[in-house]
Amino acid sequence: MVIINAATSVRCLYYSRFAHYLFSHGLDVMLFDYRGIGASRSGSLRGFEATWSDWGALDAEALLKRAQREYPGQPIDVVGHSFGGCAAGLMASGQAIRHLVTVGAQFAHWRDYAPAQRWQMLAKWHGVMPLLTRVCGYFPGKRLGWLEDTPSGVVKDWSALSTRYENLPSARNFAALPFGSVTAKTLAISLSDDPFGTVAAIERLLGYFSASSRTHLRIQPQDIDETAIGHFAFFHSRFQGSLWPIALQWLKEGELAVDVPGRTVSFKAPSPQPSPGEG
């Protein structure tokens, strides 16, 4: 059974073509919307309480428990896109995950953004987004064409400037973050033209999965004869023959094919330690 954890404020239907591909290759798949998003939204988000930590510790955890109930005996695998990879480490039952594939997974520390876009992204996601959220009571992302409307608690987490997840507003309620209980074979896929998913960003998150065997595969568009992939396009059906088999192979076997495109990056990030001035 494969659970797909979506990116921040992305409807689960975005991943339906990828889910169908996995199903056509013999894997059962579960999709879900985080609270306040898509089919899990009911009415206005003004005053609606939801955070990144809720999405992982409550929503993703609930799907994992449901998979265990409804498909007893089946191994549980997870695909996490962007924040969805972080959500996999926030589940109390994360030790049940067999194989984990993340795509562009990080928690948006601004210094990790690609240098060419860093200041623009800092202004957009850490300036304009929280400002509009304070005015509206939620982030009206759909009206702007940026993403789905987003609960204010999620915006507070995303726009925080900390280098460590445990210092984000919603994470302070954890006695200890559950990341270290995940023992899954973990493949982190990053794309060289993804301004969110730089090597530093991917490894900042990977450092939390301290009990997992971790492989970081870095792919350039030219590795698959493309000009661009970016943060979202991995899940577009045009990559069914080039990128999707990488995830499928890992979900089934927990290993990379011999002829996989890209290069593996030597994992160097330590388990996160306190930064000066943070506590």
Regions from the PLM with identified roles:
Residues N5-V10:
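Active-site glycine-rich loops that stabilize anionic/oxyanionic intermediates
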Residues C12-L45:
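Conserved alpha/beta-hydrolase
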Residues E49-E70:
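Alpha/beta-hydrolase active-site loop
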Residues E70-S82:
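Alpha/beta-hydrolase fold nucleophile elbow
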Residues V79-E166:
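Alpha/beta-hydrolase-fold enzymes
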Residues V182, A188-S190:
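Short beta-strand/loop motif that positions the catalytic acidic residue
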Residues A184, G197-Y208:
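Short alpha-helix in the alpha/beta-hydrolase fold that links the catalytic acid
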Residues I219-F267:
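Catalytic active-site module of serine/aspartate enzymes centered on a nucleophile-bearing elbow/loop
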